[in-house]
Amino acid sequence: MSPLSNFARTALACAVAALLGGCVIAGDVRPYPTMAPIQPIMPPQAQPTAGAIYAAGPTLQLYSDRRARDVGDLLTISLLENTTAQTSANTATNKESNLSLGTPSIFGAPVTLGGKDILSASAKGARDFTGKGNSAQSNRLQGNVTVTVIQRLPNGNLVVQGQKNLRLNQGDELVQVQGIVRPGDISQDNTIPSSRVAEARIVYGGRGPVAQSNAMGWLSRFFNSGLTPF
């Protein structure tokens, strides 16, 4: 067997491996952020105080509604997110260079050979570059996610965290919400809009055939990366 055929076999095997690798990578386009396993969060138990009428711990609310205020309470966040972004960039450069050397003379007479100037020279160069880019993006997210109060800050604000996993027939959907809310912004039905969540971290993603159909192939990603010289 000739060395050329061995090289062809090796190249074919590498190409097949690259194609299979590209198919596997395209399945999970965007990895999900890691979150700690969900565990019930309970407020600390108050230690009994001998000989005292009142004990430390959560108070008994007799005349107030059941809004989230303590560690372990549940709160529903209404996701109402609308974002629109648009950018445009244009770049154009042009440079021209001209160089000309006149015919030298000796004792007032030009240096010629056969009646033609042999020492005169000229050069000319030009460079042009044009670049253009446009980007437009619009996102809309609506829904409800119930989160858990994981910490109560000294100023009374609540740190909340929660996620929702949906397994559908065409893939998986995940919504993660983290942030800080102010108890005064919580409505009577124990809900709060996402626009009232400070330090908000809202993640929405999907896996499956639908998400895979919106992803570039490995060869398209290569030609759109900074590795290609074109």
From Swiss-Prot:
Membrane topology annotation: Lipid-anchor
Keywords: Bacterial flagellum, Cell outer membrane, Lipoprotein, Membrane, Palmitate, Signal
Job of this protein: Assembles around the rod to form the L-ring and probably protects the motor/basal body from shearing forces during rotation.
Primary location group: membrane
Subunit structure: The basal body constitutes a major portion of the flagellar organelle and consists of four rings (L,P,S, and M) mounted on a central rod.
Domain of life (superkingdom): Bacteria
Protein name per the record: Flagellar L-ring protein
Positions where lipid (S-diacylglycerol cysteine) attaches: 23
Residues covalently joined to lipid (N-palmitoyl cysteine): 23
Cleaved signal peptide residues: 1-22
The UniProt record lists the keyword Flavoprotein: no
InterPro entries: Flag_Lring
Gene Ontology terms for molecular function: cytoskeletal motor activity
Gene Ontology annotations of biological process type: bacterial-type flagellum-dependent cell motility
A GO-annotated cellular component: cell outer membrane
Record-stated family: Belongs to the FlgH family.
Subcellular location per the Swiss-Prot or TrEMBL entry: Cell outer membrane; Bacterial flagellum basal body
Encoding gene per record: flgH
Species this protein is from: Stenotrophomonas maltophilia (strain R551-3)
